[in-house]
Amino acid sequence: MTKKVYVKTFGCQMNEYDSDKMVDVLNAAEGLEKTDSPEDADIILFNTCSVREKAQEKVFSDLGRVRELKEAKPDLLIGVGGCVASQEGASIVSRAPYVDLVFGPQTLHRLPQMIDARRTSGRAQVDITFPEIEKFDHLPPARVEGPTAFVSIMEGCSKYCSYCVVPYTRGDEVSRPLDDVLTEVAGLADQGVREVTLLGQNVNAYRGALTAGSSEVADFATLIEYVADIPGIERIRYTTSHPKEFTQRLIDTYAKVPKLVNHLHLPVQHGSDRILMAMKRGYTVLEYKSVIRKLRAIRPDLSLSTDLIVGFPGETEEDFDKMMALVHDMRYDTSFSFIYSPRPGTPAANLHDDTPRDVKLKRLQLVQATIEENVARISQSMVGKVERILVEGPSRKDPNELAGRTENNRVVNFPAPLAAHPRLIGQMIDVKINHAYPHSLRGELVLVSDDASAATH
C-alpha cells in the first residue's frame, strides 16, 4: 500500500512553495503521496510561521490534536518545519515529546535522511542549520498540478526590520544562480505552466550569479526579462518586494515586459515616517509614493496591494491618521493588515507599548473597512468589461464551472460545457464580467484561442 504524507501549511507563499517541495522530496525518496487527511497519513508535517504569535501558538494546538493519532498508530512520524522550528529548535521536542522531526526552511531537503535516522536511532531528529542555497541542489523536479506555479529565487532576509523575526529564522539573503532559476521555470513551462510567481522574502533584492560560481551577477529586472523569454510562460508575478530595493531598472521593466502582470504587492507597513523609522524600514512615505507614482505613469491601471501593521509601539493618533491618508492616496486593492505582535528576540519587542488593545482593534477595523470599500469599488468597476484570465481549474463553488484569475488577481468563475473543461484549463481566455461579489467575480466566456474554441463545440 502506498504510504502517505499530510502537510499543513501556515503563513506565506514561501511556505506554500516549501510544503510542495517537502512532498516532492518524500515522493522521490520514499514514494509517498500527498493526502488531505491526517488520519490517513504515515507522516504528518507542520510547515510553520512565526511572524505573529497567534500563528505560532496554533502550531502547538494542532500538535496536541495529532498526538492522539500517534498514540493509535505508533509508527506515525510527526514533523515540525518552517520558521517556528528554526526559532524554537529542540525545545519543540521538550514541549511535545511525540514530535519526531524538527527542521528549518533550509533543511527540508534532508527530510529522507532525518527520517532514516529517526527510525534507526529511535530519537527525535533536529536540524535547523542554515546551509545557504544547498537545498535547491537536492530538490527533485517539481510535479505540476495546474497552469500556475511558485518558483523560489532566493532565501532569507538581510533587512532586519525591528519587528521581524524572519532574518533570524530564515537567515540572510542568498540568491539562486540565474541559470538554476531559469532551468526550473523552463521545466515548469514544459509541463504546462503558463504563470509563474517568483518568490523571495525580499524578491527584488535578488542578485544571482549567472551560473554557479560565476562572478557576474544578474539583478531582479534581468531575471524577469529572461523568464519572459521562456516559451510557454505568459504571465509573471512576484512577491514579496521591498520599497528600498525598487530600482529604476525594475520600474522600467514594467514598460519593457508585457508579461509582467498589472498587479503589485508592495508592503508599506505604515504611513508615518516616525513609525517607519522605528520599524527600521529604510524609506520614507514620500519615497514609497514616488515609486508608485513612477509605476502608475507606465501602468495607469496598476493594481496595488500592501501589508500594514497597526498599533506599533508608540503609535499616536496622528501617526494613525497618516496611515489612513496613505491608504486613501494609494487606492489599495487588498491589504494584509494586522495588529502588531511582538516577537521574542526582535528589537521592537523591548519598546514601550502604551496603546490600549481596544484602540488598536478600532484602528485595525477602520483600516480594513476602508480597504474593503476600495476592493468593492474596483471590483464593481470591472463589471461590463472583458477581462483576460488564465483558466486554473474547476470552480470551488461549483465544479461544473471553471475559474481563473485576472491580471489584478481577481478570481473569476464562469460557466463552460463540461466536455470543454480539460481543453480550457491552462488557456488564456476572454471573459465578460457580469457580476461582482465580495471576494470574486462572475462572467461569461467571450473569446478563446483556436484550440480552446474547438473544445467548446
Swiss-Prot record:
GO terms for cellular component: cytosol. Its main location: cytoplasm. The keyword Hydrolase does not apply. Residues 3-120 form the MTTase N-terminal domain. Pfam families: Radical_SAM, TRAM, UPF0004. InterPro entries: Elp3/MiaA/NifB-like_rSAM, Methylthiotransferase, Methylthiotransferase_CS, Methylthiotransferase_N, Methylthiotransferase_N_sf, MiaB_methiolase, rSAM, rSAM_horseshoe. It is an enzyme of class 2 (transferase). It comes from the Bacteria. Residues 380-447 form the TRAM domain. Its EC number is 2.8.4.3. SUPFAM superfamilies: Radical SAM enzymes. Its cofactor is [4Fe-4S] cluster. The keyword Methyltransferase does not apply. Gene3D superfamilies: Methylthiotransferase, N-terminal domain, tm_1862 like domain. Binds 2 [4Fe-4S] clusters. One cluster is coordinated with 3 cysteines and an exchangeable S-adenosyl-L-methionine. [4Fe-4S] cluster 1 binds at C12, C49, C83. Monomer. This is tRNA-2-methylthio-N(6)-dimethylallyladenosine synthase. It comes from Burkholderia multivorans (strain ATCC 17616 / 249).
